[in-house]
């Protein structure tokens, strides 16, 4: 039975912010740089946090530090506490921000990361009107450069703009659930037509691995690619978000090489002098990112934390 007179612990936001930084960056040294403190100060902060909650948050395993069960439990709450704190501050500071924010989104991001971004922006800046324009990835940079959009969400990192990683997802080979890939024959590919960064990546990956391929179906839209793959016309490569019950993942066992991860990026053109876009971009930059797909892992032998990222 829980006593009604049990004292309530008030968690220190500075301690929680450092705790999350350590978890995200994997080492005390990296976290110290992120929160502008010395490594010894970070260590002392974590000791104070353990004393405050009355639980061990870290356990040593050889050279590695691991979050304990209590540490993992606290990490989820710490993220939420900091998120609500930062959101409250941003909302009060920019509650009167008005205007029309035009966001360009690539096909890949329109039904994946974009809804989360729109929810975040509209909740913090309720007086903003949002105008969303969805086009192929290859045309996004041109739209931002011509100021047709204020910000863009894309999976292709442009060199000319500032880019904030919203999410990193695994990229897989896909075919229909009942599809049988014929070994020894060129890979039948289902791809978008040019220009397409994904198409370029797929062909470069196969060529580098000396794997023969052929174009089985070329589409002008991403829904058409999905439909063709589900119909059993061939194989494609897309981020993990494309996975559905009527598709299956192909791998090295099927003779296909690994693919690079897909980054979902929020991009801003600093040369545009667009104050509204700058405010939103900087707010997202300082906002802890809850949308990462893959768990964090520590390099072998590193003095780091092995944790699962809290995904909401």
Curated annotation (Swiss-Prot):
Q: Name one GO molecular function term.
A: DNA-binding transcription factor activity
| Classification via PROSITE patterns | HTH_LYSR
For this UniProt record, the keywords arranged alphabetically read as follows: DNA-binding, Transcription, Transcription regulation
Q: Which Pfam families match?
A: HTH_1, LysR_substrate
Q: Where's DNA bound on this chain?
A: 28-47
> What's an example GO BP annotation here?
negative regulation of DNA-templated transcription
The record's listing under InterPro entries reads:
LTTR, LysR_subst-bd, Tscrpt_reg_HTH_LysR, WH-like_DNA-bd_sf, WH_DNA-bd_sf
User: Where does the HTH lysR-type domain lie?
Assistant: 11-68
Q: Which family is annotated? A: Belongs to the LysR transcriptional regulatory family.
Described purpose of this protein according to its UniProt entry: Not known, does not seem to act on the proton translocating NADH dehydrogenase genes (nuoA-N) which are part of the lrhA operon.
Name-wise, this protein is Probable HTH-type transcriptional regulator LrhA
Q: What are the leading ranks of the lineage?
A: Bacteria, Pseudomonadati, Pseudomonadota, Gammaproteobacteria, Enterobacterales
């Amino acid at each position: 039975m829980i006593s009604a007179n049990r004292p309530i612990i008030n968690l220190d936001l500075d301690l929680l912010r450092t705790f999350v930084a350590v978890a995200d960056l994997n080492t005390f040294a990296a976290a110290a740089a992120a929160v502008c403190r010395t490594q010894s100060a970070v260590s002392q902060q974590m000791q104070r946090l353990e004393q405050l909650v009355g639980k061990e948050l870290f356990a040593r395993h050889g050279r590695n530090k691991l979050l304990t069960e209590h540490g993992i439990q606290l990490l989820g709450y710490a993220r939420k506490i900091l998120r609500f704190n930062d959101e409250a501050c941003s909302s009060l500071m920019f509650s009167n921000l008005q205007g029309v924010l035009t966001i360009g989104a690539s096909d890949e991001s329109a039904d994946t990361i974009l809804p989360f971004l729109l929810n975040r922006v509209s909740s913090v800046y309720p007086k903003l009107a949002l105008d969303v324009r969805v086009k192929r990835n290859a045309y996004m940079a041109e739209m931002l450069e011509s100021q047709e959009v204020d910000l863009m969400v894309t999976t292709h990192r442009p060199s000319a703009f500032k880019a904030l990683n919203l999410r990193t997802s695994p990229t897989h080979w896909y075919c229909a659930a009942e599809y049988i890939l014929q070994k020894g024959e060129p890979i039948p590919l289902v791809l978008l037509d040019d220009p397409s960064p994904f198409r370029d990546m797929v062909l470069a990956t196969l060529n580098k691995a000396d794997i023969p391929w052929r174009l089985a179906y070329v589409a002008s839209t991403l829904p058409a690619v999905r439909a063709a793959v589900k119909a059993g016309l061939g194989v494609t490569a897309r981020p993990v978000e494309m996975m559905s019950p009527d598709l299956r993942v192909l791998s090295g066992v099927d003779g296909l090489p690994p693919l690079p991860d897909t980054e979902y990026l929020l991009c801003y053109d600093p040369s545009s002098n667009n104050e509204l876009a700058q405010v939103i971009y900087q707010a997202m930059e300082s906002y802890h990112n809850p949308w990462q797909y893959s768990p964090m892992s520590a390099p072998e032998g590193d003095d780091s934390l092995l944790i699962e990222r809290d995904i909401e």
